[in-house]
Swiss-Prot record:
Disulfide topology: none
Spans annotated as Disordered: 266-285
Catalytic activity line of the entry: D-fructose 6-phosphate + L-glutamine = D-glucosamine 6-phosphate + L-glutamate
Protein name from the UniProt record: Putative glutamine--fructose-6-phosphate aminotransferase [isomerizing]
Record EC number: 2.6.1.16
Domain Glutamine amidotransferase type-2: 2-321
Keyword field: Aminotransferase, Glutamine amidotransferase, Repeat, Transferase
Organism: Saccharomyces cerevisiae (strain RM11-1a) (Baker's yeast)
Active site (record annotation): C2
Domain of life: Eukaryota
Molecular function GO terms recorded: carbohydrate derivative binding; glutamine-fructose-6-phosphate transaminase (isomerizing) activity
Biased composition (Polar residues): 266-280
């Protein structure tokens, strides 16, 4: 799956062209998430009609597809709801029929866009096919709009006219798996519902006048009386979706809608809605409003400054300029409101500026982002680290008998990089776990464990699943994320925000170095009461303060790296990266970047495992990149590099400035050196990884690869 975007205007006139442009711009803001098709749904020319436009390829192909219909783009809509989606093929291959949005039938009575995975879709599909529904795609999503239609038709046959959010709740009760979805319907004109379970959704709110509102009340659904009960046993063969009548209740539509007085397309359907806490009427009249819905808050930055993050099991219902949030799951830990938060994103930070692409911009931003993660937290005068987000849990954290860091992808590598300093400073066992494997193994977790969850987006599905597992085991949880309103930031007990800003490139660059520093700061803060570590802590804190300026020095290597890629590297499709100690994590991260961005096979190897098999490969002269900066392992790394040179390999050595050991080999042309500033051993990996980021970037550029949208990459792991 990939990106969701929606736009609703109420009593604010917009032309069809403006609505289409808004939806397209919203999708373009989500382009940094890898996708292979896109689509939108908007209101048609006829009363209570919806049109769908979708196409494979880039969003530009979708725009061309829309233009083929010669739509009247000047047609005004005083109120309207449109939805859009970019898709990365998961269930079903890349063909137009599999693109979102998906419909319930040829007349588009219900239209859905969806992120996530419906795990019981095969059973639902079989049941719906038995009912006469025809499926045109191979996706799991298509069962959702058809289920909407089936339940809606069944309720009408029984004499019940359900409200949209009640109907949605009935549909969601039949779904297993994860979802973030938007649904519009010709039966509910100018309305949209949004539902979340395991896949993020955020709603931006904008009025013509300022609103002094800080929360939206949650309206809990009465599961016994407030909707029809559907008895669906999808795990048994031969069963069908059936409805049992229930008594008349207040969720059934009864009174004429407000829209008949104000909107261009009035309707004779009847319903009854409660009042909205978020968008109260102004002087007794409805307030002109705009709502923007997305799976990523970064896409909302240009439109709104106030957002509401949906929680799992939430159903948001937007109609008549009002936002209602319903929840079907009542628990002791559930809040009765959703906070309206200020969106702390600057528009300039989500634009390329003078750079050719986002990856290049984000590599160069590391001078600033490493400052940002330390700002107000690292005090070089007192040699202290202050982490306000952890203070309330100080006692529990310092009492930890074990620390477990859990992450995926590059975040996992940052955890590996920080593990040795945690072990050294804290003197407790430290485990680093891949989130998916951690959950699969049902690891033993105890109440005196501290579990640290690291994620760039804060929405990585595997990491969230691991977090939920640890919460059930009553461990103390820390979140290290870049997005303050993300699931991980909200569900953990405490946390550290990396303040990295939006990272729109697929490749993790600035987030990796910021996570690395954040984890080191946590280790420093948690070990503050250990007297034996005072001098070591001072050394690290002083080194942290000059890291941003040292990164600037490393970036000056770019001309040399461009020449190296052009003359020696671009013709190769296999690379070996050698590292040991702190630098093995750098080798892992560098190899990952080269695979992801440059489309080359790259392998990270512990230097002392440079046995006969690896040396046999080295004799074929693939480029070998070795991390040989000064630390406790330098002599052994030098010995391994000598073996490579003896076998006529020509390694590229990342070493410290002024390190004379390689001068003779360099003069003979046996090696190429990339010299970086020296820092304390536990921070050297921050500087060492940047040349690999630049090599990956320039190899891709030399091969005409789109670095911001590499193939077969995704920002967050799907729920599979």
């Amino acid at each position: 799956m990939c990106g969701i975007f929606g736009y609703c205007n109420f009593l604010i006139e917009k032309t069809r062209g403006e609505i289409i442009d808004t939806l397209i711009e919203g999708l373009q803001a989500l382009e940094y998430k890898e996708y292979d098709s896109s689509g939108i749904s908007i209101q048609g020319d006829e009363l209570k009609s919806l049109n769908i436009y979708k196409q494979t390829g880039k969003i530009s192909s979708l725009k061309e597809e829309i233009d083929l219909y010669n739509l009247n783009k000047n047609l005004p809509f005083i109120s309207h709801c449109g939805i859009a989606h970019t898709r990365r093929a998961t269930h079903g291959g890349l063909r137009r029929a599999n693109c979102h949005p998906h419909n319930s039938d040829p007349s588009n009575e219900f239209v859905v866009v969806h992120n996530g995975v419906i795990t019981n879709f095969a059973n639902l599909k079989a049941l719906l096919v038995a009912k006469g529904y025809v499926f045109k795609s191979d996706t799991d999503t298509e069962c959702i709009p058809k289920l909407y239609k089936h339940i809606y038709d069944t309720s009408i046959e029984l004499g019940y006219n359900l409200d949209f959010h009640v109907l949605t709740n009935l549909v969601l009760k039949e779904l297993e798996g994860s979802y973030g979805l938007l649904c519009t319907s010709s039966h509910f004109p100018d309305e949209v519902v949004a539902a979340r379970k395991g896949s993020p959704l955020v709603i931006g709110v904008k009025g013509k006048t300022d609103m002094d509102v800080n929360f939206v009340e949650v309206e809990y659904l009465d599961q016994e009386e407030d909707y029809l009960k559907l008895n669906t046993q999808t795990k048994s063969s031969g069963n069908v979706l059936a409805a049992a009548p229930v008594k008349y209740n207040t969720c059934l539509r009864k009174s004429p809608p407000l829209r008949s007085q104000y909107l261009r397309n009035s309707t004779t359907s009847t319903f009854n809605h409660g009042s909205s806490t978020e968008t109260p009427a102004e002087n007794g009249l409805p307030r002109p409003m705009e709502f923007y819905l997305s799976s990523d808050c970064a896409s909302l930055a240009r439109y709104v400054s106030k957002v509401v993050y949906l929680e799992d099991n939430d159903i948001a219902h937007i109609y008549d300029g009002e936002l209602h949030i319903h929840c079907s799951k009542i628990g002791s830990e559930d809040f009765s409101f959703r906070t309206v938060q200020k969106l702390e994103l600057e528009l300039s930070k989500i634009k390329k500026g003078p750079y050719d692409n986002f990856m290049q911009k984000e590599i160069y931003e590391q001078c600033e982002t490493t400052k940002n993660v330390m700002r107000g937290r690292v005090d070089a005068f007192t040699n202290r680290v202050v982490l306000g987000g952890l203070e309330n849990w100080l006692t529990e954290l310092r009492r930890a008998k074990r620390i477990i860091m859990i992450a995926s992808k590059s975040s996992f590598h940052s955890c590996l990089a920080a593990r040795p300093i945690f072990e050294e400073l804290m003197e407790v066992p430290v485990n680093v776990e891949l989130a998916l494997d951690f959950v699969d193994r049902n690891c033993c977790i105890f109440r005196n464990d501290v579990c640290i969850f690291v994620s760039r987006s804060g929405e990585t599905t595997d990491t969230i699943n691991a977090l939920n597992y640890c919460i059930k085991k009553e461990a103390v949880t820390i979140g290290v994320v870049n997005c303050s309103g993300s699931s991980i930031s909200r569900f953990t007990h405490c946390g550290v925000h990396t303040n990295t800003g939006p990272e729109k490139g697929i490749a993790t660059t600035k987030s990796y170095t910021s996570q690395y520093i954040a984890l080191v700061m946590i280790a420093l803060w948690m070990s503050e009461d250990l007297v034996s570590k005072i001098e070591r802590r001072k050394e690290i804190i002083q080194a942290l303060t000059i890291i941003p300026s040292q990164i600037k020095e490393v970036l000056e290597l770019e001309p040399l790296i461009i020449e190296l890629c052009d003359k020696k590297l671009k013709q190769h499709d296999t690379f070996l990266l050698l590292g040991r100690g702190y630098q093995f994590a750098s080798a892992l991260e560098g190899a990952s970047k080269m695979k992801e961005i440059s489309y080359v096979h790259s392998e990270s190897i512990l230097t002392d495992e440079l046995g006969h098999r690896v040396l046999a490969v080295a004799s074929d002269n693939p480029p070998i990149i070795a991390f040989a900066t000064k630390d406790a392992f330098s002599p052994k790394i030098a010995s391994c590099i000598d073996q490579i040179i003896e076998r006529k390999g020509n390694p590229i050595i990342i070493c410290n400035k002024g390190h004379k050991i390689w001068e003779q080999d360099k003069q003979k042309g046996n090696v190429v050196t990339l010299e970086v500033p020296q820092t304390v051993d536990c921070l050297q990996g921050i500087l060492n990884v940047i040349p690999l980021q630049l090599i990956s970037y320039w190899l891709a550029i030399k091969k005409d690869i789109g670095v911001d949208l590499p193939r077969d990459s995704a920002m967050s792991a799907p729920d599979i």
